[in-house]
Amino acid sequence: VIGNLVCAVSENPGAGAAYARQLPRADCRFLERYTRSFNYPEQSSVKSLADIDKYGIKTYFCSNVCAAYDKGIYLKTGGFTERAIFNEDMICAGTMIQKGYSVVYAADARVYHSHNYSGKQQFHRNFDLGVSQAEHPEIFEGVPSEGEGIRLVKRSLGYLIRTGHFWLIPQLIWQSGMKYAGYFLGKRYRKLPRKVVLACTMSPYYWNRK
């Protein structure tokens, strides 16, 4: 895994980072397995600023679950931001891309990593995701995320129908609704009372440090 990530960075001039493909663990739920394959396909890719129209918000995607960075580019672009409730890896990758570097998705570097989040957990997680985007407009402004989320829902629905897992459709609707509700509120956290923010967040310690 490490060798493939290092090769992905070293063999692609201007690559500031490379991240691995995440495979579902044995206990991973059916719907989450599809989400893994949607977010981490079999084909590798190299993403740069020229790919914004093609990939949208996914151009900036990078996951610290398993990733390697070019030290020189990492330091030159400022490394990880000091304050981020979530998405520090994506903020770092987005900064690199905006400064003319690229990020590699190395599908041949594989790790097992997945979650079986409940709807409530998805709400909290996506609230923090929305907060991170609201706090870093220099990265996310003008690159909407909603379209990618809608595409995932549509693809997931089609997959459930094709495979005959109709009874999971209500779960898809519930989980997707909770994701969007959390994200919607997180993007607008500045308008919310502190008590509401603390009830919505997955990371109360972050707000206690603000």
Show the residue positions of the predicted features.
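A short, conserved alpha-helix in the catalytic core of glycosyltransferases
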Residues: 66-69, 73-78, 83-110
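Short, hinge-like loop/turn segments at secondary-structure boundaries
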Residues: 33-39, 121-124
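Short, flexible, basic/aromatic active-site loop/helix in glycosyltransferases
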Residues: 20-26, 37-59
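A recurrent flexible, glycine/aromatic-enriched loop bordering the glycosyltransferase active site
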Residues: 48-72, 84-85, 91, 133, ...
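Active-site-adjacent helix/loop segment of glycosyltransferases
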Residues: 103, 109-180
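Juxtamembrane C-terminal module of membrane proteins
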Residues: 148, 152-155, 178, 182-210
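Conserved donor NDP-sugar-binding/catalytic core segment of glycosyltransferases
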Residues: 1-33
